[in-house]
Amino acid sequence: MSKSLYEYDFPKDLKKMTFDELDLLSYQIRDFLIEKVSKTGGHLAPNLGVVELTLALHFTFDSPKDKLIWDVGHQSYVHKILTGRAKGFDSLRQFGGMSGFPKVCESPHDVFDTGHSSTAISLSMGMAVSRDLKHDDYNIVAIIGDGAMTGGLAFEGLNNISESGRRVIVILNDNGMSISPNVGGLAKHLRNLRTSNQYLNIKKTAKKVVDVPYIGDSLYKGMRNAKDHMKYALLPKGILFEELGLTYLGPVDGHNVEELVNAMQAAKKINGPVLIHAITKKGKGYRSAENNPDKFHGIGSFNPCTGLPNPSKGVSYSSIAGDEILSMAKDHDDVVAVSAAMCDATGLRKFADKYPERFFDVGIAEAHGVTFSAGMAASGLRPVVAIYSSFLQRAYDQIIEDVCIQKLPVIFAIDRAGVVGADGETHHGNFDIAYLSTMPNMTVFTPNGEKQLREAFRIAYGLKSPCAIRYPRGECPLDNNAVAEPNCISENTVIDLTKYATERSFSGQDVDIWAVGRMQEKAKEIRIILEEKGMSVGIVNVKMVKPIDLSEFDDKAKIIVTLEDGTLNGGFGEQFSSKLYTQRIDRDRFENNQTSLISKDEYNNKVITIGWPDKFIEHGDVKNLEKKYSLDAESIAANIEKRYNELNLDR
């Protein structure tokens, strides 16, 4: 009877195994992944596709002395199993449990905290410089793929490595996918390489030659020189990576451990940058994931027997946003949609199917996607760019330089805004309010629920200027009238944003809560708690954080609370407070030298700003994270009541 994965002493035991034993282990690992991820959710399909690749890595290299750098990091589950962390999978991505990404604090085998795409090659170059300057001797391996090679940063790194000539091994995990299928010229080039039998046969021969005693290395170098002269005849389009200065090994079967080990051993003998091109299948070994790799890229809990996800509670913000963008496209021929390799995840699949000529997937290239959209906007189109909040950070410069400065009508549909949970620090979207609100010409919508979300898109189309619409992950509160309302916004509509930005839903003399976006729902919970304690509580729904509208400001309220699902530093609360100090209005009760809405002393006493603290928030269920950081309704209500009592206010 074979051992369970918990009984192995990994990675030590791995190096004692035969190739046949490693093949058997690959089946065991896949069964383990399916069982565990079906309960916790996670990145299943990418990890099923790298089982043999990861086995070969830990069989060939000596981690942690040799540095294994996982690009993005979502494909590191097998790596975690093979470095002694199998028991951690019961708490994978759970509050207080094991991260779904490499974490330096978790294991010495995790050499860098990754989470975003296309960084591993640049990281490997930096580590190679450090190694060489210190005269150390170890291998540095960057594992990149699952679409990450479509990112420009990856090619900046390749360019730098090829120029330096430093000893770095890049392993390209080519599964033809990112989240959606790979797009662009690079994807076509890789497909050509996969089908080049002539080149593959030469490489197989070369790998055999390396193993010839005493003379193998010399013969291999000679074959490399001969290959340089032959490749143009064999492959008219050339080998892109060879032209960039890397020795190219492959394509190799990414599900054959022996082939992979042979390629890696050959790469270790080359004194310079090497790229191993491994062909893998995303979702390998689990039919549901093989047939629907995009659905199983990142998935919640599911039934492992049927492959069907566990029932969701409702309709997501992403789905409603996608429907509204499609509705805009039906009404306006100039509307186009742009995705960064996340068509399904951002709700754009219906749009792509209905209007394929108006849908553009730019790959994992957010910066390019924004400037590409700016070009379309400058030429008369109305692009809607649907990107996760965390990933939009990668295009910060392009938003300012190419969109806002020229006041171009690009609509940013910012999905997964706020703290999103299980994927942790690298995937939370809690900085967008702070950085987008500082950009001149930018309008920022923060809708809560279906009605406000649909309205935001309709108003944004009519503004003819840069607009950002941020909305959270998960279930969207529905409104039966939201779809039925006519689309009254046209290119000639004039919108008075100051009359739309805020909306009072409740009035109260004791506490006034200004709630941004999804926090409007939490404000209702807080109101119930405080009113049971005898307080009168008002709520202002903040549907836009730029411009900030103070028309609903009630200076008679004893306590004013701002509530946002974003970082406090530079967030709505700080900007709201600043405007209270500086806004100049005419009111009879103010003298000429007292023109602010609120004095500094009053502010210190009565204004409470609530949001996420100045730190990177870890992974875990959102409710648990809110509880830890006192952002749950009960903790916020207690905080307000404490301030109220400290001021000796009457109820």
Indicate where each model-derived feature is located.
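Extended, hydrophobic alpha-helical segments in both membrane/secreted and soluble proteins
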Residues: 140, 144-149, 153-157, 347, ...
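Helix-enriched interaction subdomains in cytosolic or periplasmic regions
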Residues: 301-303, 437-482
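Glycine-rich, histidine-containing beta strand-loop boundary motifs that form or position
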Residues: 48, 70-72, 144-145, 172-174, ...
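N-terminal amphipathic, basic-rich helices that act as targeting or association modules
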Residues: 2-81, 240-246, 251-257, 277-280
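Thiamine diphosphate
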Residues: 91-123, 133-137, 163-295, 308-353, ...
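Short beta->alpha connector loops at strand-helix junctions that form conserved
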Residues: 362-363, 387-388, 446-449, 563-565
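Cofactor-binding active-site loop characterized by glycine-rich and histidine/acidic residues
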Residues: 43-164, 334-335, 340, 348-349
